[in-house]
């Protein structure tokens, strides 16, 4: 007797390897429970692979954008640019680590649900596995806007610092010119008195 409220959803095709692992770990499970569990693991693997690929593409895009935007500032002020690029790389690493922590949390949640499956009814277990799979498939882990915002902030800071340095150099140049004029006037006045 099955619960009529549990709706049938299409099961993601699981690899033979994944199915065999699930069968080994759950020898007394029904074929449907094994298929749903294997589908959950496939969804997790699919999502993790997509996130790794997206993170790689996003990291490459962010890096190229940062290099293009900051190329002028890098030539003019290499030390400042090096510090800013290091900060961007650090931010990207932190975002990647956060994404892996989310994937690990999803995996842990799925494993906990598999362990609890022996204690709950077959229908409740299948429902929990389907919900976990849906959560994995709908979860967005990469925050593209935050990485682009960090790159833009780095560019703004580099330009602002460069303008401050240029103003200071211009001010020094003006003071040196004024000092040279004053020295020349004093020197010519001294020689004019002697003649």
What are these regions (language model features)?
Residues 15-195:
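Amphipathic alpha-helical membrane/lipid-surface binding segments
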